[in-house]
Amino acid sequence: MDPLKICENYLTFRSIIKGSTFSPGVFRRWRFHGLADVVGNIVEREEGRFWEIVPETHTLWAVFRGGFTVAPFTEILTSLQLENRGRQLAFLAFLSFLLRNWPSDSVVSEDARLDLVCAPAWSRIQIWSQAARLINDLPESVFEGQGSVVEEEQGEEHLARDSDDPFFD
């Protein structure tokens, strides 16, 4: 399963994120894409880690309460790395976590929250996917003579640590 491929269509992506915010059970499994159930299960399993990243006292929640989302999402999305399936699933789960825990007294209606989260995230995913396709389509001759042996060894070491587990330590 390639999460980025599945999320190419905005409405599908939006539906997956929305579905992942529902409690586990028959409704989530049958009403939404299978990826919504996977993402929802990750959120439930790793919720403690998400709370460590963004504790209840974090200013992000106050910003969301006030309806300001552009600056926080810009900061979150610019550092986004989606090299492998684990990171992709972790990112989708983090979006679901934010929506599940959005302050109920926020000036933003529940309907608008989904699009405030999904629109910039989907745009970033599309940019990431396009860049990855362009790099993969480059001829090998472009890369000849670039990089040193040390850089290649570091790259191999990074790949050795790469995992599909969304929270690989």
Curated annotation (Swiss-Prot):
One of the GO biological process terms: symbiont-mediated suppression of host apoptosis
Region (Disordered): 147-169
InterPro entries: Adenovir_t-Ag_E1B_19kDa, Bcl2-like
Record has Membrane as a keyword: no
Biased composition range(s): Basic and acidic residues: 156-169
Entry's family note: Belongs to the adenoviridae E1B 19 kDa protein family.
Protein species of origin: Canine adenovirus serotype 1 (strain Glaxo) (CAdV-1)
Pfam families: Adeno_E1B_19K (PF01691)
PROSITE patterns, per the entry: BCL2_FAMILY (PS50062)
Name used for this protein in its record: E1B protein, small T-antigen
Keywords: Early protein, Host-virus interaction, Inhibition of host apoptosis by viral BCL2-like protein, Modulation of host cell apoptosis by virus
Origin: domain of life: Viruses
